[in-house]
Amino acid sequence: MVMILRRSLINQGADSGAHRTFIPELHTPKMSQGPTLLSCGIMENDRWRDLDRKCPLQIDQPSASIWECLPEKCQDGSLWHQEAVTACAVTSLIKDLNINDHNGNPSAPPSKRQCRSLSFSDEMSSCRTSWRPLGSKVWTPVEKRRCYSGGSVQRYSNGVSPMQRSSSFSLPARANGLSSPCHQSSLHHRFGGQPCQGAPGSAPCGQAGDSWSPDPHPVGGGRLDLQRSLSCSHEQFSFPEYCPPSANSTPASTPELARRSSGLARSRSQPCVLNDKKIGVKRRRPDEVQEQRPSLDLAKMAQNCQTFSSLSCLNMGVDDHSSQSPFALVSSTRSWTALLSASSPGGRTPAGTPVPEPVPHSFDDQFTCQEDLSCDESDGCSLDEDCCRKGDPATSWRDRGACTNSLCSLDGELDIEQIENN
């Protein structure tokens, strides 16, 4: 209701001529235009009940007689007397208020901190908790893996946004309700007989947009709630009974059929469907034919070790002849003859050089000859001994080989290459 109020100045007795429209539903009367007048909104609570609400108060300018400026008539037409007005207004309004400030300055508005403390009390601050980005129960993050072996799923005809094919293709998490019989027929209608490009070997869908589009004719009100979580286990969407293998796929052409009797045959054109299960697995190669390794002959190895040790003893006896007794050479010769007698019956040493059978009586002659030679050398042949020490070890070996009556005829020198090969 729009009321035209006519305000008269009672002291002057003249009309001000100010007419204003006033809507009481929109404008709650507040006396906040004067200096330090009711800035906290106390006028809204109980003071206006004392003054009848049927007679709203309108003030243009603050004046000395601010409480005397009241409308002449109320809505019901009853006149207010000046005595009743002054008694009601002054006693009820100015009793608790100090209109004029001591300094004459208008009061400053409350600070932000005071407003915050007033708007949010201390009792409620104990219940308030700081917001933290917690893990959402509705949307769970799905790791996105890129697949470079093929393109992306084409856009469906009804305008559904295209999905990029990846191994983490996911559907609503609460999909276990799809196993109810009311959803199975609709799923059979929507999911074609073609394995889905994105689901890892198990999620059958005719086209990608068809599985995501809401069912135009839901059976029993069943449709995929796409507002739910978009991550779920892929085992919930394996429906082997709805998608039989195609007619041209045989166990010979698709060997997955024999291995997966319960599941779906994976499309051979999509080699990366199961790449999340094959991370770091190399492609199997045909086994190479390994050559038969020769067995180890331990007896022959022992003979080779004895041969090497005996030859090294012979060389040491030749080099360090000055610091050794003359019987060291005889002992090394005995070990060499023992090695020859223990060799193979074909008369061949492990080095492969042909050796004649040893003559037993010549060994005694050699022993006596060696003793006589050592005695003669110890008596007076010091010059020959020095020459023999300073000479080549090969020539000394030839001299001793000739002295032994070709007991082990190695053609005058050792076959080093054969020894190294063995």
From Swiss-Prot:
- Establish whether keyword Phosphoprotein is in the entry: yes
Q: What does the record note on quaternary structure?
A: Interacts with CTNNB1.
Similarity-based family = Belongs to the FAM53 family.
**One record GO biological process:** Wnt signaling pathway
User: What's the stated role of this polypeptide?
Assistant: Acts as a regulator of Wnt signaling pathway by regulating beta-catenin (CTNNB1) nuclear localization.
Q: Where is the composition biased (Low complexity)?
A: 244-269
Coiled-coil region(s): none
Modified-residue entries (Phosphoserine), positions: 119, 168, 170, 180, 213, 269, 335, 344
Which parts of the sequence are annotated with region: Disordered? 193-225, 243-269
The UniProt entry, under Pfam families, shows: FAM53
Please tell me whether the keyword Nucleus is annotated for this protein.
yes
Motif window: Nuclear localization signal? 282-285
Q: What is this protein called?
A: Protein FAM53B
**Which PANTHER family does this one have?**
PROTEIN FAM53A-LIKE ISOFORM X1 (PTHR28567), PROTEIN FAM53B (PTHR28567:SF1)
| Keywords, in A-Z order | Nucleus, Phosphoprotein, Wnt signaling pathway
Can you say where in the cell this protein is located? Answer: Nucleus
Q: Which GO terms describe its cellular component?
A: nucleus
